[in-house]
């Protein structure tokens, strides 16, 4: 995915692939700067990602990478390697796309929503960590007064067009078809939007408080049933063509 982004000129955090234990933590930090985040190259539901994955020095990086290579509760987190990338501080958005890259005229790019993290969190903890997402709290603490870890709100209209464009460009760079959710972060220091990842055939739900898809449907006044019908109709249309 990252290689495809780079080839197509899609803005994405600077990254390094780690495929075995023969890594050089100091060299990785030299290339990416700090802070950086390490995460499984392929995962789902934030598995393998926690607040300690964001590191600022070589010692913390070594500790976290060793932990990832050990696995988590029997899960192999590094089957497809590890990605280390610059950690982007700033607001996070997610965009739902239904359609096909080679038929943009028939595709639908839904309005982006912003994932707003609890204000008590430090900047380097404002992302979907496994413990907090699934309310396990083995290594991380819950929000004060049992408040929500995050909430969704509609993207600022001033940047909506730009977020939708970069999301579509990332989708097209991967020859996307079907339905996809694209995660984007805007660097609060530079204003540059960066694609974090494209989540192919992402989980879909009508829960507007907990899930991004539910929130997107809420803000577009569309029902979950209508979304499912849209996805099915798109699949049949591609089959005919």
Language-model features, listed with the residues they occupy:
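Active-site nucleotide/adenylate-binding loops and adjacent lid/helix of ATP-dependent enzymes
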Residues: 1-90, 101-103
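ATP-dependent carboxylate activation and anion-phosphoryl transfer catalytic cores
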Residues: 4, 9-10, 104, 148, ...
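A structural signal for short, well-ordered beta-strand segments
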Residues: 15, 95, 112, 182-184, ...
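Short, solvent-exposed polar/charged micro-motifs at secondary-structure junctions
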Residues: 24-28, 92-96, 236-239
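Short connector loops/turns at beta-strand edges and beta->alpha or beta->beta junctions
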Residues: 42-43, 135, 201-203
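A short small-residue
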Residues: 46, 138-152, 212
């Amino acid at each position: 995915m990252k290689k495809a982004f780079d080839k197509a000129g899609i803005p994405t955090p600077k990254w390094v692939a780690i495929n075995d234990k023969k890594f050089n933590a100091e060299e990785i930090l030299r290339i990416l700067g700090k802070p950086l985040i390490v995460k499984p190259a392929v995962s789902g539901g934030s598995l393998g990602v926690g607040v300690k994955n964001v590191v600022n020095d070589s010692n913390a990086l070594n500790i976290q990478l060793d932990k990832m290579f050990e696995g988590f509760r029997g899960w192999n987190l590094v089957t497809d390697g590890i990605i280390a990338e610059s950690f982007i501080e700033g607001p996070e958005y997610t965009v739902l796309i239904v359609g096909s890259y080679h038929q943009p005229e028939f595709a639908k790019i839904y309005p982006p929503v912003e994932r707003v993290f609890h204000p008590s969190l430090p900047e380097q903890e404002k992302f979907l960590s496994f413990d907090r997402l699934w309310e396990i709290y083995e290594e991380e603490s819950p929000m004060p007064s049992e408040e929500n870890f995050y909430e969704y709100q509609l993207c600022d209209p001033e940047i909506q067009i730009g977020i939708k464009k970069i999301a579509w460009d990332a989708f097209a760079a991967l020859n996307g078809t079907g339905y996809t959710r694209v995660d984007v972060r805007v660097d609060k220091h530079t204003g540059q939007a960066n694609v974090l990842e494209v989540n192919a055939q992402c989980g879909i739900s009508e829960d507007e408080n907990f899930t991004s898809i539910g929130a997107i449907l809420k803000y577009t006044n569309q029902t979950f049933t209508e979304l499912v019908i849209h996805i099915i109709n798109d699949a049949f249309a591609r089959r005919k063509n």
